[in-house]
Amino acid sequence: MSKQPISNVRSIQANINIPMGAFRPGAGQPPRRKESTPGTAEGAPATPEEKKPVPGMKKFPGPVVNLSEIQNVKSELKYVPKGEQ
């Protein structure tokens, strides 16, 4: 059985492991962080009266629901097995 010559191109292609997008501009650098303005305090929570709608946010039909209310009610619920009813 005669051995066929191994092509260098195939051996390079088989061993290469480059992630997708590695050759894009800016690849390899971590994403830039947005710098906050020094005049705003990040730790101060805004009251509902001070909150302004976010531009580009969709307004869904129906009433606005407070998520914390739902979570509180859900935590008060208790599982009752079928035999105890």
Swiss-Prot record:
Modified residues (Phosphothreonine): T47
Phosphoserine PTM positions: S36
Presence of the UniProt keyword Phosphoprotein in the record: yes
Transmembrane stretches, start-end: none
UniProt cross-references to InterPro entries, sorted A to Z: Chisel
Region annotation Disordered: where it falls in the sequence: 19-63
Pfam families xref list: Chisel (PF15355)
Example of a GO cellular component annotation carried by this entry: muscle tendon junction
Keyword terms, alphabetized: Phosphoprotein
Top-level taxon of the source organism: Eukaryota
Chain's role: Plays a role in the regulatory network through which muscle cells coordinate their structural and functional states during growth, adaptation, and repair.
Stated family: Belongs to the SMPX family.
Stated name of the protein: Small muscular protein
Protein source organism: Rattus norvegicus
